[in-house]
């Protein structure tokens, strides 16, 4: 299961609830396609302390009054505003005054107003600053098969031989279950792998590593066949 600080999802299928940044299990099986490239500019930040959980990351300034774009990693994106004081990747403590969906963007992209921040210049200074919450402010996973989605972001995905397959850059859910978005070792377009026990048999959160059973053509361009494909 891949929880997002407020409600868990799981490798056993469905979510048990959602409120902020969720934990989730891996579902036993899923008919979801293992491949769906989706380019992203940069991997999410890794918490500077294992006792911190990533909740969001600021982007560029929005308008002239101090608002700023914010990517939320919580199960309910707007629930990030309910966590109170948050620690930043540059050592500060910030609190969100309010958030709203960013027009024309994905549901996890918000427009935020930060307490004490006014004017475009101050908002621009927040670009690429990440927000974290202390782990002890979150509910503990209910079993060994649960993990916070934020703990997976930045983790290495390896095959059974220990060879690096890619790095997890996001844990999206489009309604059919959690997915791992993987970026190949040498960069390039990402691909999606169902977060199920069939595709992700081993979780090692402490080592920030998961073992995956990924198809050989996971990162192949649409329509491209493996070199040994007889067709």
Swiss-Prot record:
Compartments in which it is found: Cytoplasm
InterPro entries the UniProt entry points to: PRC_barrel-like_sf, PRC_RimM, RimM, RimM_N, RimM_N_sf, Transl_B-barrel_sf
Main location: cytoplasm
A GO MF term: ribosome binding
Keyword rRNA-binding among record annotations: no
GO biological process, one term: ribosomal small subunit biogenesis
Pfam short name (any one): RimM
Residues annotated as domain PRC barrel: 144-218
Region (Disordered): 1-52
Keywords: Chaperone, Cytoplasm, Ribosome biogenesis, rRNA processing
Gene3D superfamilies on file: PRC-barrel domain, RimM
GO CC list: cytoplasm; ribosome
Domain of life (superkingdom): Bacteria
Function: An accessory protein needed during the final step in the assembly of 30S ribosomal subunit, possibly for assembly of the head region. Essential for efficient processing of 16S rRNA. May be needed both before and after RbfA during the maturation of 16S rRNA. It has affinity for free ribosomal 30S subunits but not for 70S ribosomes.
Family annotation (HAMAP family): Ribosome_mat_RimM (MF_00014)
Summary of subunit composition and partner proteins: Binds ribosomal protein uS19.
Domain notes: The PRC barrel domain binds ribosomal protein uS19.
Protein known as: Ribosome maturation factor RimM
Native source organism of the sequence: Methylobacterium radiotolerans (strain ATCC 27329 / DSM 1819 / JCM 2831 / NBRC 15690 / NCIMB 10815 / 0-1)
